[in-house]
Each structure stands twice: as structure tokens, then as C-alpha cells.
Amino acid sequence: MRKSIGYFEGTDSTLLTALVCEGHDTLPVSNGFDSHGMHVRLINEQNRVDLLVGYVHKIFAPEPLLPHQPSYQDVFHICRIYGIPLLLEVPEALQEKAASLLEGVPDIVQFVDPADMERVAKEILNDQ
């Protein structure tokens, strides 16, 4: 069964190509700043994706500087409500620091080393 992967701008094209070659679809998702596709806050039950992938800097914005823009908590909320796993590509050596930037990281969010992204994404997609 075809699954859909929402990806933030800059996501590794090799990863996306591998997932397409496995029979999945990809959909660009915008963080609100880059206009890179459907705005992440517009994801709902009718247009939900099966997996979101991206980088920490695509969901993390200094809230005091940009109070009216979507925050990582908005992304986490969407992931929790619709059961969408979020893979954030972070080198293993930086994962603890990345996690400390984001308060209340839900279990549905994983920090994944770049070398493991394809494997982890396929495992999630195959288990759904």
C-alpha cells in the first residue's frame, strides 16, 4: 500500500528518492517561512501524511522573536493528534542537545542519525 511522506525543505533527496522507489509518495510541507508546499498547520484527517521528515531547524524558531509563526509545539500537536511519526535528522552526537532545545518532545518524534534515516523511515512505513 502506498504511503505518503511529508518532507520539509532541504530533506535529503537520496532519502526521498529511495522512498519513492519503494512505492511511496512524497509531499512538500512548509514551515510557514519557506513556502515549500502545504503549510504544516493545514494537515488534517483528510490530507494527513503517514510520516513527516525534516531537520530540527525547520521546526525550531526562537519564539520570542517570532510569536505569530508556527512553533515546534504546533508540529508536535499535529503529529500527536493525527498519529503522524516525525523523524528529525540529527547527527547522533547532537541528538541530546537537539532534544534539549525542544520542550516536551512526544514519543511520536524521533531524532535519527543521517545514516539511519532510510532504514528507520522504511521500518515505520512498513509497520503501519
Segments (PLM) and residue ranges:
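Glycine-rich, charge-decorated loop segments at or immediately adjacent to ligand/cofactor-binding or catalytic sites
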Residues: L88-P106
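Proline-centered loop/turn at the N-terminus of a beta-strand
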Residues: G83-L87
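Short, charged N-terminal beta->alpha structural module
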Residues: M1-N31
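Conserved beta-strand-loop-alpha-helix hinge of the TIR/SEFIR fold
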Residues: N47-Y72, Y82
